Amino acid sequence: MPKMKTVSGAAKRFKKTGSGRFKSKQSHLRHILTKKSSKRKRHLRGKKLVHDSDTKLVQRMLPYV
């Protein structure tokens, strides 16, 4: 059976935590920031965990992580 390939775009966006879940950067913080409040931008700076229903998809994209 051939080797499974890692999706390189996913490898740049997701990191695995110690508990086996995946974390990523929040979206919506690249442009059009003037209409967004300081509170909203501050909360978008943090990391977020991938939802449980999407974890299987991310694991399939990152077979060796």
UniProtKB/Swiss-Prot annotation:
Cellular component, GO, one term: cytosolic large ribosomal subunit
A Pfam entry, by short name: Ribosomal_L35p
Keywords, in A-Z order: Ribonucleoprotein, Ribosomal protein
UniProt-recorded Gene Ontology molecular function terms: structural constituent of ribosome
Biased composition (Basic residues): 12-30
Disordered: annotated segments: 1-30
GO biological process, one term: translation
Keyword DNA repair: no
Family to which the UniProt record says this protein belongs: Belongs to the bacterial ribosomal protein bL35 family.
Protein name (Swiss-Prot/TrEMBL): Large ribosomal subunit protein bL35
Protein species of origin: Alteromonas mediterranea (strain DSM 17117 / CIP 110805 / LMG 28347 / Deep ecotype)
Lineage: Bacteria, Pseudomonadati, Pseudomonadota, Gammaproteobacteria, Alteromonadales
